[in-house]
């Protein structure tokens, strides 16, 4: 894997992969535990995310991106596919899934609460579209509960009279880092 860092704090991880004879799945190297080869088929997952994103007023992809920022800021022991999988599952029945970006504060708060309530004994989740098993890398519930509480504080600042925008922004930055929200 090659890491490509950018000055804004975003880092891309580039992994070589090889298209298999079925023209839909890929084989890629896994450097963990002495090395091995793994196979993935991302197209059904991409299609499922695209379909659900369209069904929820294009709120799924921003949620995935925000939660990846949170994962990186808090060094949460979960992979990107698990972030996407959990976001996908959460937004399916979320009451504000079709609202505008003005509800992102509530969406983040409610997602943190939903994640905090995930069973700590659960070892894997099924990825959208492909159904492949996505394994957790460690417990994430404690950090999720902490960020849920911080999001409550941020929303309290946002809804105060008069509104305390600077304080709210500082709380959101405590969760997502200084590049969010801008």
Positions of predicted regions on the chain:
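Conserved catalytic core of two-metal-ion nucleotidyltransferases
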Residues: 1-25
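Conserved nucleotidyltransferase catalytic core and NTase-mimicking acidic/glycine-rich helix/loop elements
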Residues: 59-165, 170-173, 178-181
């Amino acid at each position: 894997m090659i890491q490509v860092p950018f000055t804004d704090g975003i880092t891309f991880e580039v992994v070589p992969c090889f298209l298999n004879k079925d023209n839909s799945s890929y084989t890629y190297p896994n450097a963990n535990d002495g090395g091995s080869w793994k196979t993935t088929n991302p197209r059904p997952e991409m299609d499922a995310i695209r379909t659900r994103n369209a069904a929820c007023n294009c709120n799924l992809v921003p949620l995935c991106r925000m939660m990846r920022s949170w994962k990186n800021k808090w060094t949460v022991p979960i992979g990107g596919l698990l972030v996407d999988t959990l976001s996908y599952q959460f937004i399916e029945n979320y009451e504000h899934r079709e609202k505008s970006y003005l509800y992102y504060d509530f969406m983040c708060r409610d997602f943190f609460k939903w994640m905090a309530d995930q069973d700590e004994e659960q070892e894997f989740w099924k990825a959208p579209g492909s159904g492949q098993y996505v394994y957790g890398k460690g417990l994430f519930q404690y950090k999720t509960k902490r960020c849920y509480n911080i999001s409550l504080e941020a929303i309290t600042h946002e809804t105060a009279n008069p509104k305390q925008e600077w304080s709210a922004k500082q709380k959101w930055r405590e969760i997502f880092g200084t590049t969010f929200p801008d």
